[in-house]
């Protein structure tokens, strides 16, 4: 175990000089004891570069307040490691695997795995394609999720990415009883706190491990916390043979943290000021999220889109790895349609007749073509009004509006705000409901009856409450 001395401190980046034959390897964890007002604190550093002359450049996982030149640094001889296995369920951790909830500390005998590792080899990968039912109509019908796939939730600020993730955690735990790992990467501490207490109240927390590196933490923690969460998920997949869900909120903050330290590490910035290693860092994370012959890790990642610009290098780097995208659209939130998922922009490679079946595929495509036709007619309606449309076009518009409203539904996790009970709709009921709308079976029911309901039975009940004969 080598000993070194701090030679330079630049915010979250610290240079350390070691003896000639004791220079630590890249990704090794180093430990510094720092004197602060509250006493002596252990600060963990991760080796990022070897600069030559026995100096390494490191990234701090916590605040560097109190670190001085000449402070002694110890090489741990290994990379950062986090606890894995059943002991992590129901607990909240930081990037280093230390518990940050109010319960007692984990036993030191709990197994720990290093956060840096290779992706599974080709011969270990599974090629089986299976749909993951979410109970959310717009997703299950138009952009279904694949077990062991990677799904991106794209949207600007405040369009509902985190609420959608919370609903997915709730639905999958309640309906499928699956294990989830939640990695909070650079998001609001309040949201993490709310999520923890909501999950505790619903009992879902017993099946979930949570890892947080929030907005107020240094970029080193935000950059590595996704790997900490992934390592916990990999153990459930590889050792216990489980199908695990890994939620990352928000993957953009992972990139943002990398760009914050990149310049301090001495790298030349690339497009829009991002780090030149953007594609490599993203690939190293995403390639580990996969299905193997032992089990699967299905990843659902919220992706913040800066200024709603999908060509920005950060969201573009994520796109390349995804099996399905769920695009959230601000215009839909303005119309009061929740979840505000854009039915035309959201995609999935699972929307294929050989995977979902011919009926589901045809109804999904008919729904999309009806909505597309409605979108094309909106300019004419805005200028000339509905009266100028042909009878066929009027019928298309009326059905499209019913479809648009029927794609919305109440969420379980939003019950406390809306006062409405949440809905879980099985795929079969979703497909039957949209088929009935396309066939004109419900043309006599006012479109308001389709807003924020679950199955078609709820539409009929709502219409009766409105005094309509069904």
Curated annotation (Swiss-Prot):
CC annotations in GO: plasma membrane; proton-transporting ATP synthase complex
EC number(s) from the headed UniProt entry: 7.1.2.2
Principal cellular location given in the protein's record: membrane
Top-level taxonomic group: Bacteria
Membrane topology, from the record: Peripheral membrane protein
Location(s), subcellular: Cell membrane
Catalyzed chemical reaction(s): ATP + H2O + 4 H(+)(in) = ADP + phosphate + 5 H(+)(out)
Keywords attached to this entry: ATP synthesis, ATP-binding, Cell membrane, CF(1), Hydrogen ion transport, Ion transport, Membrane, Nucleotide-binding, Translocase, Transport
GO MF annotation: an example: ATP hydrolysis activity
Gene3D superfamilies, per the entry: 2.40.10.170, Bovine Mitochondrial F1-atpase, Atp Synthase Beta Chain, Chain D, domain 3, P-loop containing nucleotide triphosphate hydrolases
Residues that coordinate or bind ATP: 155-162
CDD domains attached to this UniProt entry: ATP-synt_F1_beta_C (cd18110), ATP-synt_F1_beta_N (cd18115), F1-ATPase_beta_CD (cd01133)
InterPro entries, per the entry: AAA+_ATPase, ATP-synt_VA_C, ATP_synth_F1_bsu, ATPase_a/bsu_AS, ATPase_alpha/beta_chains, ATPase_F1/V1/A1_a/bsu_N, ATPase_F1/V1/A1_a/bsu_N_sf, ATPase_F1/V1/A1_a/bsu_nucl-bd
Broadest EC class assigned to this enzyme: translocase
Annotated Pfam families: ATP-synt_ab (PF00006), ATP-synt_ab_N (PF02874), ATP-synt_VA_C (PF22919)
Protein task: Produces ATP from ADP in the presence of a proton gradient across the membrane. The catalytic sites are hosted primarily by the beta subunits.
Oligomer and partners: F-type ATPases have 2 components, CF(1) - the catalytic core - and CF(0) - the membrane proton channel. CF(1) has five subunits: alpha(3), beta(3), gamma(1), delta(1), epsilon(1). CF(0) has three main subunits: a(1), b(2) and c(9-12). The alpha and beta chains form an alternating ring which encloses part of the gamma chain. CF(1) is attached to CF(0) by a central stalk formed by the gamma and epsilon chains, while a peripheral stalk is formed by the delta and b chains.
Protein name: ATP synthase subunit beta
Lineage, highest ranks first: Bacteria, Bacillati, Bacillota, Bacilli, Bacillales
């Amino acid at each position: 175990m080598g000993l070194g001395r701090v030679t330079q401190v630049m915010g979250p980046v610290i240079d350390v000089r070691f003896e000639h034959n004791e220079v630590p390897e890249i990704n090794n964890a180093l430990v510094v004891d720092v004197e602060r007002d509250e006493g002596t604190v252990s600060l963990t550093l991760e080796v990022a570069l070897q600069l030559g002359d026995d100096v390494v450049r490191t990234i701090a996982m916590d605040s560097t307040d109190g670190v001085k030149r000449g402070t002694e640094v110890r090489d741990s001889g290994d990379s950062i490691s986090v606890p894995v296995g059943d002991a992590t369920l129901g607990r909240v951790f930081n990037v280093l695997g230390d518990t940050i909830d109010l319960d007692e500390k984990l036993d030191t005998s709990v197994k720990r795995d290093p956060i840096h590792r290779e992706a599974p080899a080709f011969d270990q990968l599974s090629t089986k394609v299976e749909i993951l039912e979410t109970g959310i109509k717009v997703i299950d019908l138009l952009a279904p999720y694949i077990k062991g796939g990677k799904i991106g939730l794209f949207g600007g600020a405040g369009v509902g990415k985190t609420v959608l993730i919370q609903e997915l955690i709730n639905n999958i735990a309640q309906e499928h009883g699956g294990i989830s790992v939640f990695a909070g990467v650079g998001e609001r501490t309040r949201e993490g706190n709310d999520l923890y207490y909501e999950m505790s109240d619903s009992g879902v927390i017993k099946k979930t491990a949570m890892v947080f590196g929030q907005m107020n933490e240094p970029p080193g923690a935000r950059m590595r916390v996704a790997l900490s969460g992934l390592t916990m998920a990999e153990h459930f997949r590889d050792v216990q043979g489980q199908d695990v869900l890994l939620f990352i909120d928000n993957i953009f903050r992972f990139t943002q943290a990398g760009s914050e330290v990149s310049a301090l590490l001495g790298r030349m910035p690339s497009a829009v000021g991002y780090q030149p290693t953007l594609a490599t860092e993203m690939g190293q994370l995403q390639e580990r999220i996969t299905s193997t012959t032992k089990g699967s890790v299905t990843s659902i990642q919220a992706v913040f889109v800066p200024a709603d610009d999908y060509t920005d290098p950060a969201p573009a780097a994520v796109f390349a790895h995804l099996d399905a995208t769920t695009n959230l659209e601000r215009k839909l939130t303005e119309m009061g349609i929740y979840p505000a998922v854009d039915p035309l922009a959201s995609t999935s490679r699972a929307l294929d007749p050989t995977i979902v079946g011919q009926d589901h595929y045809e109804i999904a495509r008919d729904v999309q073509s009806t909505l597309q036709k409605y979108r094309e007619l909106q300019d004419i309606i805005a200028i000339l009004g509905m009266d100028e449309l042909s009878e066929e076009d009027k019928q298309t518009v009326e059905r499209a509006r019913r479809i648009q409203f029927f794609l919305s539904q109440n969420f379980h996790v939003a019950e406390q705000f809306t006062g409405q009970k949440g809905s879980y709709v099985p795929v079969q009921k979703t497909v039957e409901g949209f088929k009935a709308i396309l066939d004109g079976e419900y043309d006599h029911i006012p479109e308001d009856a389709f807003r924020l309901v679950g199955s078609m039975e709820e539409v009929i009940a709502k219409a009766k409450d409105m005094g309509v004969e069904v």
